[in-house]
Every structure is written in C-alpha cells, then in structure tokens.
Curated annotation (Swiss-Prot):
Taxonomic path: Eukaryota, Viridiplantae, Streptophyta, Embryophyta, Tracheophyta
Xref: InterPro entries: DIOX_N (IPR026992), IPNS-like_FE2OG_OXY (IPR044861), IPNS-like_sf (IPR027443), Oxoglu/Fe-dep_dioxygenase_dom (IPR005123), Plant_2OG-oxidoreductases (IPR050295)
Names of the cofactor(s): Fe cation
Transmembrane segments: none
Catalysed reactions, as listed in the record: 1-aminocyclopropane-1-carboxylate + L-ascorbate + O2 = ethene + L-dehydroascorbate + hydrogen cyanide + CO2 + 2 H2O
Gene responsible for this protein: ACO
Binding site for Fe cation: H175, D177, H232
Gene Ontology terms describing biological process: ethylene biosynthetic process; fruit ripening
This protein's record includes keyword Iron: yes
Pathway it works in: Alkene biosynthesis; ethylene biosynthesis via S-adenosyl-L-methionine; ethylene from S-adenosyl-L-methionine: step 2/2
Keyword Cell membrane: no
Protein name: 1-aminocyclopropane-1-carboxylate oxidase
EC class of the enzyme, as a word: oxidoreductase
Organism: Dendrobium crumenatum
Keyword terms, alphabetized: Ethylene biosynthesis, Fruit ripening, Iron, Metal-binding, Oxidoreductase, Vitamin C
EC numbers, comma separated: 1.14.17.4
Amino acid sequence: MELLEGSRRSDAMAVLRDACENWGFFELLNHGISHEPNEQSETVNKEHYREHYRRFREQRFKEFAAKTLDSGENVDGDNLDWESTFFLRHLPTSNISQVPDLDEDCGSTMKEFALGLEKLAERLLDLLCENLGLEKGYLKRVFCGGSDGLPTFGTKVSNYPPCPKPELIKGLRAHTDAGGIILLFQDDTVSGLQLLKDEEWIDVPPMRHSIVVNIGDQLEVITNGKYKSVMHRVVAQTNGNRMSIASFYNPGSDAVIFPAPELVEKEAAEKKKETYPKFVFEDYMKLYVRQKFEAKEPRFEAMKTMDAVISSQPIPTA
C-alpha cells in the first residue's frame, strides 16, 4: 500500500486493476492496519474457540463427522464443510455484546480491529473507483444507499481443525462471496485457501500480516462485469488447526444494486456485453443462502426478473 503514496503509484494502480479484472483476488502488505490489534484478535479468538466453541460445537461436529469419515461410507462431501464458525456484526448495529460467551476483552479487541478494517475497505473502494473512472465515493454511496445510510459490515471467524480424511470433504466448499469487498486475515502457518483461475485451483499461501482481498458478487454487478467475483474454497488439512478472520463490507440490506450508468454507457458505445440486473441487496441474499455453493450466473439471471419492480433511485452526492 505504501507504493500508492510515491512515484510508483501508477504502477501500483495498474497491478490493482489487473488483479480486479483478471483474478478477483489480491494481497495487501503494509496496509496500515496495526499488527497489534490483529494479533490480539487472533489470540482472543483462538482462546474463545478453545474455551467455548471447541467444547460444544466442535465436539458435536467431530462426533458426527467421525461416524462418516472413519467408515468412508455415506459421506456427502458436496453438502458438508469441515469448518466451525461464529459471526460478529458491526454495522448497521453491533451484536458483539450479544454473542454468547464472548468476553469483554475479546469484544473490545474485535471492535477496534473492525474499525480499522472498515476504513481500509472504504479506502480500497475509492481506489477501485479511480481505476474504473468513477467519481470518488461512488461505490460507498451505492453501498450506503439504503434507508439507514449505512453499509452492512461483519466478521466471520472460522476454525478448521485437522481432518482425518481430507479427500472426502472440503474445509469450505467452492463459492463466490455474495457481498462487496472482503478482507481476510488467514492463518499464517496452516494453508488451505485456493482460488479458481482458468479452470485450475491455485493456492493462496499464508503470508504473515498480509490481508487477502477479494471481489464479491455486488461489485461484479456494479462494474457490469468489469471486475469479477471468483470461486474459492478451503481445502481441509490433516495437520494443523487453521483459523481465518474474514470481514465483509457489503451494501445495506435495502440498498438498490445496479450497474454504474457511466460504465454501461461506455460499454454501449464500445458495443460490448449486455448489462447486469438491478435488484435490492436483501433479495439477492435470500437467493444466495439457498444457492451459495452453486454458480453465480443463474443467480444474476434470476435477479433480472425483479428489474421491472424496482424503481430507479438516484444516488445522493452528499
């Protein structure tokens, strides 16, 4: 990120553009998020799992999995994930104080952690605007275009314990992310994350203090396909306990999502592809929860039927 402040800014922006257009993923170093709250959040979340979730959820999960994986019979690996998770919501309202067994230290650490990530996500959105030729702040205004004027922002903490038979089950099945821009701190010692590029699965290796960023479905729609969300998955490992902390900066639930008119006009002049649909983000999410592990294209097609019932709403400029 420090390259954006110096003489190599144009080179850094070109790398960012290529990553968004051709990969849907990129990795940030020197991103401005202090290592201390990141390391604290990792520590407290590991302690939280050890003291609470591993005692209940993970134990029940392992007991269930053992019945199938040990025998190798009746395993429906297409409908199972070797993953234990909990979720924290930051915006529009926080639920941290309501999360069971989440102690005060963990909660305050995660609040500080989330505040820095929220600012970083908004900075990244402005960099995307610059590369796209959109007005600064455009993407944030779209995301905040709902009735409360706020985005949806939350964090998913995932734990992937050692798996006795990883050939039978994924840590997390292949999917694209439904929302906007995703910032991931992945485990810096245990690997597993892969992305799909040209029909080939490519490892995203652990790198200490880096943030893996990926494009969600909503940015694909807003950019009218110029930037793509990409299938990714987590491969279960026989050794090591993998933890990841993923923060999702998404549109508000009733925000209306549609291709940026400026991009559509430009592509129309160049006689390029048809436009993506227009829809309310919450409606897309209702479909996504049923089809998360399926291809995204049918979801976009299904949303086209809703175009006629959504009125055009100008995005505020202030």
